[in-house]
């Protein structure tokens, strides 16, 4: 877009009058984060085609192509990506997208740390909490995300994922790598979200200690 303050000196199609404030302008030779990319209208995504393929894109005014050299990092939910991928009108984008799957947390101890961080930044930081509440919520969430193994207990699998050694207590328990190899790459992509778990905690928290 044009910087209105500079129109007194330059014409509208002069490069010096252009306001280089867009995402691609600011992220040139850097990293551009695109939040919820696949919810955006297709017209918004068009500049990304030439920016990623040819290293330039057209601005909103009558200027020559602007250079771009950087990385575009977009994140989205699985369902939105599947809908975008299945639309044949988006074939030009699919060849330029590299998928990095980010599963939910599969370690109970790390899930608890996430809850504590969320609670410390909320109005519930001073509210009383019964012992074991966060541990139970974390175990419930992680159990919903991991795949049930064959010839072994899913509870033992959860404990192994958390770094425990069960050789002396559960002879059927497998190693961490054996569980991961059997589960495949999609483990952790489904199940209860951390956002949902925090909503549950916010509802059951005891606001009144008396």
Predicted regions span which residues?
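Conserved ASCE/P-loop NTPase catalytic core
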Residues: 1-210
């Amino acid at each position: 877009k044009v910087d209105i303050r500079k129109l007194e000196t330059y014409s509208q199609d002069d490069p010096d009058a252009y306001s280089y404030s867009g995402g691609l302008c600011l992220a040139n030779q850097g990293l551009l984060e695109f939040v919820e990319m696949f919810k955006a209208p297709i017209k918004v995504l068009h500049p990304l085609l030439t920016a990623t393929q040819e290293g330039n894109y057209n601005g909103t005014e009558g200027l020559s192509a602007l250079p771009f050299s950087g990385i575009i990092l977009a994140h989205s939910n699985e369902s939105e990506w599947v809908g975008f991928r299945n639309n044949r009108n988006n074939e030009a984008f699919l060849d330029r997208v590299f998928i990095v799957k980010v599963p939910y947390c599969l370690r109970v101890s790390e899930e608890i740390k996430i809850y504590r961080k969320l609670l410390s930044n909320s109005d519930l930081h001073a509210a009383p909490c019964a012992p074991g509440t966060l541990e139970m919520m974390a175990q419930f969430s992680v159990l919903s995300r991991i795949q049930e193994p064959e010839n072994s207990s899913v509870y033992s699998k959860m404990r192994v994922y958390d770094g425990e050694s069960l050789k002396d207590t559960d002879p059927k328990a497998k190693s961490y790598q054996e569980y991961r190899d059997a589960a495949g790459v999609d483990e952790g992509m489904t199940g209860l979200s951390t956002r949902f778990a925090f909503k549950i905690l916010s509802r059951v928290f005891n606001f009144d200690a008396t």
